[in-house]
């Protein structure tokens, strides 16, 4: 079975997650330091890493590794904050 249709779907879902996160923060409907924002970033980047690696787009893999690392770091900090 050819995996490329599933890889393509994963890539488009990753794009959608990142764009939704950016839209929500840009329209002040979500905080940039919030857990949902960081989850959208990490999930979207993970899906784009899968897609980019499959197609051999290593610069895209690199930027998305950095993106997911930043999201994971921010997520860990957000989860350590006391709840008010």
Task: Show where each model-derived region lies.
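Structural signature of hydrophobic alpha-helical transmembrane segments
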Residues: 4-16, 60-68
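N-terminal signal-anchor/start-transfer transmembrane helix
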Residues: 12-26
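Alpha-helical transmembrane segments of multipass membrane proteins
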Residues: 19-23, 46-53, 72
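Short, amphipathic, aromatic/basic-enriched membrane-interface segments that mark the entry/exit
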Residues: 26-37
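Transmembrane alpha-helical core residues of multi-pass small-molecule transporters
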Residues: 40, 44, 66-67
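Short helix-adjacent coil turns
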Residues: 56-57
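Alpha-helical transmembrane segments and their membrane-interface exit regions
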Residues: 67-76
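Short, charged juxtamembrane terminal tails flanking transmembrane helices
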Residues: 80-84
